[in-house]
Amino acid sequence: MKKLILVIVVLLMIAACGQSYEETKRITREQRREAMRKDSAALKVAVMPTLDCLPLYVAQYYQLFDTLNGGVRLKFYNAQMDCDTAILRGRVEGVITDLVRAKRMEKQGLKMRYVAATNAYWQLVTNRNARIRQLRQLDDKMVAMTRFSATDLLTDRARDSVKLAPNQVFKVQINDLNVRVQMLQNNEIDALWLPEPQATQARLMKNPVIMDSRSVKLQLGVLAFREQEMRRQARGKQLALFTQAYNQSCDSISKYGIAYYRDLLIEHCKVKSQLIDSIPQDIRYAHAHGPRQQDVAYVEQWLQKIDTLKTNARNGNK
């Protein structure tokens, strides 16, 4: 009798475990579907550990995006090319990028809606041990940049300004900003383009700056969204509310200063507190408005030149 009772108890336990396991699987599937639904409804924006993304970090922290149906989700990347891949493949609806990359993606068939021209700028920093103090000294030197981006265009601008031939300056594609900084620290690169706050980090290490994108009057930073997605009524409403929150953040940063948001920069840009005090505090954040036509024209002209050179090179090899 005791054995029979024991068998019954064991069978009941097995049945209970089986039900528990199946129930757990069902709940997990439901949770996964719910997470996917929420992610799909949210407005997703690809961002980087750079200062031009600060308005989005501020808006997220102070819950300015909470009025959006579905909310906003920031997707973090360390390389501009990874951000652009995310929007090309539909993983995000928006991206903080540069005008060259955005126009390049449009040439590849992705229509973009330009919501804001950001205050992004890039500095050409040289390795202090390379003793490069002028642009003409880039002859036979390696410059870290990203192909078909603002830094690619700016490298050409720097090279052409001192009449160096294309084969005299070696462009090295290093997409990850952290890797660029590490290469500078390890004396593995002669020169490199850096945005803020990475440029400040390089300057604090006593590395010279020989060119600044602001000195050539180019404003190349942009916040752009997938045009086709934004034509949907629900997305259009989200974008309008997103823009309001973005403008509020810009006003707040301009009022209180960059250093006021020290904790956000430490968290998202992975920099030390002392570095933030060395970032130029006169940087301003403007309300959302599209890029200037003069910048668009310059970028399109440069991209056309690159395409022509590639076509001529292919024809010459035939």
Residue ranges and their predicted role:
Residues 2-7:
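Sec-dependent signal peptide recognition
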Residues 15-16:
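C-terminal motif of bacterial Sec signal peptides marking the signal peptidase cleavage site
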Residues 19-26, 149-170, 241-279:
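Ligand-binding clefts/hinges and TM-proximal coupling segments of bilobed small-molecule sensing domains
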Residues 21-165, 171-172, 183, 190-196, ...:
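Short, glycine-/small- and polar/acidic-enriched structural segments
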Residues 21-31, 35-43, 51, 260-318:
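An extracytoplasmic/periplasmic, membrane-proximal ligand-sensing/linker region
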Residues 43-44, 142-145, 228-232, 247-254, ...:
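Second-shell loop/turn segments in exported
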Residues 99-100, 168-265:
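Pocket-lining segment of extracytoplasmic ligand-binding domains
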